[in-house]
Swiss-Prot record:
This enzyme is involved in nucleotide metabolism: it produces dUMP, the immediate precursor of thymidine nucleotides and it decreases the intracellular concentration of dUTP so that uracil cannot be incorporated into DNA. Its cofactor is Mg(2+). Keywords: Hydrolase, Magnesium, Metal-binding, Nucleotide metabolism. Pathway: Pyrimidine metabolism; dUMP biosynthesis; dUMP from dCTP (dUTP route): step 2/2. GO terms for molecular function: dUTP diphosphatase activity; magnesium ion binding. Belongs to the dUTPase family. InterPro entries: dUTPase, dUTPase-like, dUTPase-like_sf, dUTPase_trimeric. This is Deoxyuridine 5'-triphosphate nucleotidohydrolase. It is an enzyme of class 3 (hydrolase).
Length: 145
């Protein structure tokens, strides 16, 4: 199992945890002194009170929680958000209220999922043209909707 160092930069922070044995993402919670209300169409930055030290070659991806998206239209506008291995600051989550009603976030509310993922740097090679495929340049619904 991959070891990731984590620090509570706020003593009241709640450590992320996997909700089930086979969950890909850990639930990550808000760390707030007072409740935060997100108005419809408003975007806010929510602190978690945590900082992580990821091994080289790994990133942490922050993703929306499906229940918040379905029930309240609360999402992450930059999903998946990336936390790089060399970042040492507090993890914060950008939330947007796409719904019609104000949404209140309280301390300890699970606001996102954090997935630890391996990545590789690519070496780009400029060429005159790309190899041909049956699909070609078809995209944006070319196989139907």
């Amino acid at each position: 199992m991959l070891k990731v160092n984590i620090v509570r930069v706020n003593k009241n922070a709640i450590l992320p945890r996997y909700a089930t044995q086979h969950a890909a993402g850990m639930d990550i919670a808000a760390c707030l002194d007072v409740p935060l209300t997100i108005q419809p169409s408003e975007t806010v930055l929510v602190p978690t009170g945590l900082a992580v030290e990821l091994p080289e070659g790994y990133e942490a991806q922050l993703r929306p929680r499906s229940g918040l998206a379905l029930k309240y239209a609360i999402s992450l506008p930059n999903a998946p958000a990336t936390i790089d291995a060399d970042y040492r600051g507090e993890v914060k989550v950008i939330l947007v209220n796409l719904g019609q009603e104000p949404f209140c976030v309280n301390h300890g509310d699970r606001i996102a999922q954090m997935v630890i993922a391996r990545y590789e740097h690519a070496e780009l090679q400029e060429v005159e043209e790309l190899s041909r495929t049956p699909r070609g340049s078809g995209g944006f619904g070319h196989t139907g909707v």
